[in-house]
Amino acid sequence: MTHHAGDLSRRHLSRRHVLAWTTSAAAVAATATVATVMAACTGGEGPDSDEEAGVARLDVVDSTGALLDFDGLREIQSNGAGEDGWDDQLLDPDTLEVLVHAPLYEDDESSAAVDLPDGGAATLTMSWPTSHGYSALLADIPGPGRYSLAELAARALHERQQSRLDAVDSVDSAASAEVRALRDDAAAALAACSAASDPAQRAARGAEALEAAAGAQLALDEACQALAPADAVIGVTFTQPPDTAQISQAVGIGDGQRQMAARIVVDDASDPGEMDAWRQTITALHAAGALALVQVCDSQTMTSFNAHAWDERVAALVAGLPEADAWEVGNELGGSWLGDDAVDKTLRAARAVRDDPATAATIVVVTLYYQLGQESAENSVLTWARDELPSELLDVTDVLGLSVYPQLHPLGTGADRVLSALAEAFPDQRVALTELGYGAEDLDSGPWWFGSQQDTASARTATARHLTSAALGRERSWGAPFWWYYLQDEKPGAPGGPVGDVLSDVATGSQDQ
């Protein structure tokens, strides 16, 4: 039976709220390159004891410039959600794989401290705000000592921006000039950090530097839409068969300048009526020059299929929708709710697609569930992908995508670094943003925000514009953002309003230059 939007939304209520908060720690010895960071021990304390213990002390301040204690740091990190919002991890600076889970602890001298594995460099990630909203903070800690946390994060952003900015400059000098001006502000703020007289002043100046560097990063991410490959698609998701008007509206997003793609989410593959409706949808998409991406199974329902039922579903989809251009054989892999057989099911689906002559040459997509620290160390996205994706599956996978829900798992200024790490880890696949949503009723309990804390429409627009631009604007991008609630959000009067216009803006702005 064809599902309704309300039914699907209720099913996703449990899926999107799965946050396996854990307090267990896992440490892995790792070798990392020490970053060039201007940071000094202060207050008359020598670095020797910290160096021997591998301790990095971290300072943050409140809006008045007063140093915060550990509880104050946790309050900001979680946006008032308490322990459920404690999402810190120490990562390998190059791969962003987890070194230590939940490393932050209370310290008598500073706001917080971490023990660095082998006393070496590591990257601390946690949710942290600027005026733009919450991001996945990525603060490169060069070694033991005392630091302004915000300054470390600002330097990590600033030092990684130049190569991307040079690439933008070659195709859009006006956009690059705007980013350069913002970077000049960040550079001045970082220079001021080095002249601070005490930890509180340095942390306050670090906060100013992070604000400036974050603004430059977000502007750079949007400017990078000019770098999008000519064949990268602008995507939406159909969670039910659309009518003719909805299809026409959706395919218009590309505005004739970038190919549009629609992911179709099949509820009951054994329902002849629903399958016929999806065949008509694919025909209409093709007539308009758009692509059809079939989702084999939404992650929320994967565990409801035993091995036999799974194979039957996949066979019915492949036989019933052979005209599809691409197949998402695994959705939100790495999610802790998927069960132990998720990878095996995904591999069997990929084999079925590759083995059928009608679909053998189509694009095979695997979507990973993005989160860095909100769940266990094992489920952190890059750790999970490196450890759990078998070579046999990778050999038949063309695209690795991310599913991102910023209210549950902030990304923000961390987007470029995370996407770059994914691309570097899997050089044989193209990368994509294959699921994105913000502001839906079943996401509102997420403690974090981006774009605007009060105005859902502004927040949704900011999220769609930023992450679509960041995902499209890279050499091996396949597409973005495959907005999950597209049909619901485009309805007149929908809370938070539509996303079609902002996606069209990005598609037009990302015209290959």
Task: Please tell me what each predicted stretch does.
Residues 432, 436, 449-511:
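Substrate-binding cleft of secreted/luminal carbohydrate-active enzymes
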Residues 52-86, 116-187, 191:
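Amphipathic, heptad-repeat alpha-helical segments
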Residues 34-51:
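C-terminal region of N-terminal signal peptides and the immediate post-cleavage residues
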Residues 13-19:
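N-terminal export leaders
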Residues 243, 272-276, 301-395, 404-419, ...:
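Active-site cleft segment of glycoside hydrolase catalytic domains centered on the general acid/base Glu
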Residues 1-13, 24-38:
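N-terminal secretory signal peptides
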Residues 192-245:
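Long amphipathic alpha-helical scaffold segments
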Residues 73-113, 122, 229-309, 322, ...:
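N-terminal substrate-binding region of glycoside hydrolase catalytic domains
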